[in-house]
Structure formats: C-alpha cells, structure tokens
Regions:
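Hydrophobic packing and interface segments
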Residues: 1-171, 175
Length: 178
C-alpha cells in the first residue's frame, strides 16, 4: 500500500473538522434571517462545500496522491449524509423542508384526537416509514462507492464514503448550541 492511502483519512478528517468549524461559525451570519431552520441547514451545506473543496484541492495540488474516484466516494457519502439529515428533518419537523410540506407530525397530532391507541399506531407507522428512505440511501451509497472504487479500491471507497457521511454530521450537535 502507498502511504498516501493511509494518510487520506487523516487528512480528510482534518479538512472535515476545519470545514465543520467554519460551518458552525457561519451560523452567526446566517441566523439573522427569517427562518432558523434554513440557517441551520445552510451551515451543513457550507461545511460540506468547504470539505469537498478541501478534499479535491488536496488531491489536485498533489498534497496527497490518490485516485480521484476515492474522493468521489467521499462526496457520495457526504451527499447520502445530507439526504438522511433532510429526510430526518422531514419526518420529525412541522415546517416544510426545502419546499416540501411535511405531513408526518401533523398526522400523528390528528390521530391523537381519536384516542391513545390510534396515536400509538400512527406514531409507530410514521417511525417505521421514516427508516425506509435512509436504509435505501445507505445501500445505494455502498453500491455507488464500491463501483467508484472498482476491483482494486472498492472496500476502501466504501470506508471513505462512510467517513464522508460521518464528517458531515460532526457539526450537527454543536450547531444547535450557537
């Protein structure tokens, strides 16, 4: 193995932490808008964009000599992570998510009017439905990362996609406190 493939996760971790910190601090600028949920969502997009630029920049500049498909799999993992976050926001919120009006929580609230049994059934069904899309997204992310890695780097690309997925959510717990 080449040392660059060992150093790639370490370098991406560093880039991801820096991008997440910048994303968290961007909340100070974005929170002055009308919708705080949009500002929170945009901090994730800012962090992801900086993470992608830093990763591609490190490869293009020759700082780390790895196949470009590996960085593509990291971006794929990041996109899967962002989509999972949006799906979670859809199923747990009452505000529209990127223009799509949610019906999950209002449906549970409506079922509460008829009694505790229908409330429990509605909550259970929404909870079960909310896991379907993330599972499909993760499966597609695994398949896509394996395809990007080919026969040589397939498993490595799956691991790097998982790293991209997790680095996007580093700022999630901290951004809610700003």
């Amino acid at each position: 193995w080449d040392v660059d493939y060992v150093m790639m996760p370490i370098l991406l971790g560093f880039i991801g932490y820096i991008a997440s910190i910048v994303g968290v601090f961007s909340m100070a600028i974005l929170k002055n808008g009308d919708d705080p949920a949009v500002a929170l969502r945009n901090t994730t997009f800012i962090g992801a964009g900086l993470f992608w630029l830093g990763g591609y920049g490190a490869i293009q500049s020759g700082l780390i000599g790895v196949e470009m498909g590996i960085m593509h799999s990291v971006v794929l993992g990041s996109i899967v992570g962002i989509l999972i976050g949006l799906v979670t926001e859809y199923y747990t919120g009452i505000e529209p998510v990127m223009g799509v009006k949610t019906k999950a929580i209002p449906h549970i609230g409506e079922m509460s009017k008829t009694g505790p049994a229908t409330n429990a059934i509605a909550g259970l069904s929404v909870g079960m439905m909310s896991t379907f899309v993330p599972v499909v997204l993760i499966a597609l992310g695994i398949l896509g990362a394996n395809k990007l890695g080919g026969d040589t780097y397939g498993l490595y690309c799956i691991a790097m996609a998982a790293m991209g997925l997790s680095l996007i959510h580093i700022s999630e717990p901290t951004r809610h406190k700003t």
